[in-house]
């Protein structure tokens, strides 16, 4: 394998990001800046501007918009979780491309896994925290 073939092969190896119950696998390929999530346009898939902006925030921070094609495969959870998973996967992929971005991404908190999960429902009450109505008499 030549050096350019090796660089292309590593550039297309997917990186994973997770949030809540969602998982995103992202491939970054140097190109014109086209994006697809599960074969669809980001706005068509995520449906809200805020989720699209949050998902592609790492590209904005690194000033790399229009320099990479992003191909993402997302599964599990809801749209917010998928957007967060996509954000982390893109940040990890950018750091793999350019190690100098690690400090910048770290300061923005883009490389840290958000460990918050849904709290379980407890027995003897209707939800995780809510209690049944108390009657004194």
Where are these regions (language model features)?
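Structured, basic alpha/beta domains of bacterial-type, RNA-associated proteins
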Residues: 2-20, 24-75, 80-137
């Amino acid at each position: 394998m030549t050096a350019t073939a090796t660089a292309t092969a590593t550039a297309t190896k997917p990186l994973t990001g997770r949030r809540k119950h969602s998982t995103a696998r992202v491939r970054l390929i140097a190109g014109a800046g086209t994006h697809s999530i599960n074969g669809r346009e980001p706005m068509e898939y995520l449906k809200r501007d805020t989720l699209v902006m949050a998902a592609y925030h790492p590209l904005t921070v690194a000033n790399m918009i229009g320099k990479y094609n992003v191909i993402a495969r997302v599964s599990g959870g809801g749209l917010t979780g998928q957007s967060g998973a996509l954000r982390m996967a893109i940040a990890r992929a950018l750091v793999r491309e350019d190690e100098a971005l690690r400090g910048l991404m770290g300061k923005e908190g883009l490389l840290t896994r958000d460990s918050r999960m849904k709290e379980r429902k407890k027995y003897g009450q209707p939800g995780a925290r809510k209690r049944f109505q108390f009657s004194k008499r």
